[in-house]
Design a protein with these regions (language model features):
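Alpha-helical transmembrane segments and their membrane-interface boundaries
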Residues: 1-76, 80-244, 248, 253-300
Length: 300
């Protein structure tokens, strides 16, 4: 299961680099883009929002079919959007090698419990073929449709509001919009959307304190590792508490990546975007969950 998750993430990362590169080099973008960056072409943001919506549907389908945990398209939408939104893309060879090394390291860490003794051993083996619980078509079609629709609507709303409200990270709204879709039943799905907003607000305070400290590079990396560990400790027990640490983890990771890409980092703008787009996306996701529920209630 871990290997399958790594394979899907690897494909997602390469897809993000390919999509950003293709948009930057497309004939429509030539002559309008400065230094080959995607952000200078107005239609690029709309195109990328559409691609991310498709990624949400495809990865939700694959995670359901392979029974990956945690389910849903959340992490893959985040990875795709974060990589594709970078002002410059790394050489493809460098990206491939780095991704493979990190995935192998993660797999090794996952199997490190074997060092504690035989009682922690679990036989190696390729997992059974993927399955859908229940009728395949009845599961697959609504799953893909809801994820694509939710991410598309959230992306559209964020883009339409980007100029008057000054927000610049559309994929954060799309990310928040798919969170409720991983919950079941409807009450749990709505709770996940609300919990994300509440937890994100608290996490923004922690992220602001971390950014105000202006940590050096080595300290920034340690903070990211710390928040990652804290997230893993609490996310299963409490989604709200998990968001307290996921939010600074995500923002500091973006800050680190932008520094590596040579871009200017405005911590205040990142905090503003994260908070506002989380509210937009969560609202869209909750409505997406409630609409089928309302239709079922009326049809009874």
């Amino acid at each position: 299961m871990q290997l399958r998750a790594g394979m899907l993430m690897f494909a997602t990362l390469l897809g993000a680099i390919a999509a950003a590169t293709l948009l930057a080099s497309s004939p429509a973008a030539e002559g309008t883009m400065a230094e080959g960056t995607m952000a200078e072409w107005p239609m690029a943001e709309w195109s990328m929002a559409g691609v991310i919506a498709l990624v949400a549907g495809i990865t939700a389908l694959v995670t359901q079919y392979w029974e990956l945990r945690p389910g849903g398209s959340l992490f893959f939408v985040f990875a795709f959007g974060a990589v594709a939104s970078m002002p410059t893309q790394p050489p493809i060879g460098e990206a491939v090698v780095t991704s493979i090394v990190v995935i192998c390291w993660s797999l090794a860490m996952g199997m490190s419990s074997r060092l504690l003794g035989r009682r922690f051993w679990k036989p190696f083996g390729w997992p059974a073929g993927g399955v859908f619980r229940g009728d395949a078509a009845a599961v697959a079609y609504p799953l893909v449709a809801l994820n694509v629709a939710s991410a598309a609507v959230a992306g559209t709303a964020a883009l339409l509001l980007s100029e008057p409200w000054g927000i610049n990270h559309t994929y954060w709204a799309q990310l928040a919009s798919v969170v409720p879709l991983a919950g079941h039943p409807t009450r749990l799905a709505v709770n996940r959307g609300l919990h994300r907003v509440i937890g994100t607000c608290g996490g923004l305070v922690i992220a602001a304190l971390a950014s105000l400290a202006h940590p050096p590079l080595w300290a920034l990396i340690l903070l990211i590792a710390l928040f990652q560990g804290l997230t893993e400790l609490v996310i299963v027990r409490s989604y709200v508490l998990g968001q307290l640490f996921v939010t600074p983890l995500a923002l500091l990771s973006i800050e680190l990546a932008m520094q590596g890409a040579g871009a200017d980092v405005h911590a205040g703008a990142l905090l503003y975007d994260r908070g506002l787009e989380t509210v937009i996306g969560s609202a869209v996701g909750i409505v997406t969950v409630l609409l089928p529920w309302a239709v079922r209630k009326v049809s009874r």
